[in-house]
Amino acid sequence: MSQPFALHHDGENQMQRRGKMNTRSNGLSGQKRAALGVITNQVNQQVRIQPSRAAKPKSSEFNIQDENAFTKKNAKTFGQQPSQFSVFVDPTPAAPVQKAPTSHVTDIPAALTTLQRVPLTEVPGSPDIISLEDSMESPMILDLPEEEKPLDREAVILTVPEYEEDIYNYLRQAEMKNRAKPGYMKRQTDITTSMRCILVDWLVEVSEEDKLHRETLFLGVNYIDRFLSKISVLRGKLQLVGAASMFLAAKYEEIYPPDVKEFAYITDDTYTSQQVLRMEHLILKVLTFDVAVPTTNWFCEDFLKSCDADDKLKSLTMFLTELTLIDMDAYLKYLPSITAAAALCLARYSLGIEPWPQNLVKKTGYEIGHFVDCLKDLHKTSLGAESHQQQAVQEKYKQDKYHQVSDFSKNPVPHNLALLAL
């Protein structure tokens, strides 16, 4: 039989076991354990002491490699009563002491503090107060006094009263430039003055039918005369020049100008839209793109606004002004402002109004002696208007909206200008 193997006795472990046993015997002999054990945290200890963080031990008496290191440490404290600890309680903050606010206003007079408040009384009803229940109109709309004259917005926008004098002086200088040459028809080889009269008479009808502005008509005739002053035109192309000039003037003056196809259509499709556009391009090159020119119509409207003319005076003045478009030879030698002044003076004289008051002298800078020759020519033209071959202007101003100023049976033209003391 083999002998029983010998147990290895570890002296160190034996000593530890003896220590453990002695510790247990000493702890149990002094105090017996109750049913649920002895509660070391007594109930009457209400305050918990905040445990402090223990410092890291410098070294252990046992090697970290020893598997019984933790057992040994626990063996020393097993059965011992743990140290008591308390709970940290924040101290109750004291109530803040409120200080009485300091007033920035001191020494208020007693007269102000003892004022008695008077209750508001009801305001009796007034007939001027508008009741919203009885009126459907806005209470903010107030009637203007009858004697107050309404503002002429168009006059303010177009004339700009602050710069009216500067604008007028500038246009007086501009009218001397870009003028048609008087007597240019003598240098034309294939067209005559009567052909031009027929063309302008046709353009008057076109502008009236298409409801174009009067300024558009005057601009178109200005482009025609300036173009014919520099370029010889065949009679077969004269109507094309007129249509292209009116098309250019409409694009410059009108807000919604007619389409180029309409100008080709009014020629009974004699010319195509492409031909009208090509002629427009040629006219612009010949005129060097100077299309913004002052016309007789512009000066006439400016003079009429300055003298507060009524509708009949305006219509008669415009009728006399348009008569100058037909007769080229007599009026190309006059400046547009001179022609406008003569037309206004003759219209006032025909209606029995003072022909040329001082306010017009101040406005225009003209005396009657400055335009007396144009006045005589215009008087002669108006006397022969009824017998003229071209009657478009006559028929236009026989309408009621123009007060039938071209009907000489109702508005006869003075036979002489003797009362003007010329």
UniProtKB/Swiss-Prot annotation:
Source domain of life: Eukaryota
Single biological process term from Gene Ontology: mitotic cell cycle phase transition
InterPro entries found in the cross-reference section: Cyclin, Cyclin-A_N, Cyclin-like_dom, Cyclin-like_sf, Cyclin_A/B-like, Cyclin_C-dom, Cyclin_N, Cyclins_cyclin-box
Region (Disordered): 1-29
SMART domains attached to this UniProt entry: CYCLIN, Cyclin_C
Keywords: Cell cycle, Cell division, Cyclin, Mitosis
Molecular function in Gene Ontology: cyclin-dependent protein serine/threonine kinase regulator activity
Role, per record: Essential for the control of the cell cycle at the G2/M (mitosis) transition. Interacts with the CDC2 and CDK2 protein kinases to form MPF. G2/M cyclins accumulate steadily during G2 and are abruptly destroyed at mitosis.
Similarity-based family: Belongs to the cyclin family. Cyclin AB subfamily.
PANTHER family xrefs: CYCLINS
Name of this protein: G2/mitotic-specific cyclin-A
Naturally occurring in which organism (per UniProt): Spisula solidissima (Atlantic surf-clam)
The organism's taxonomic lineage, starting at the top: Eukaryota, Metazoa, Spiralia, Lophotrochozoa, Mollusca
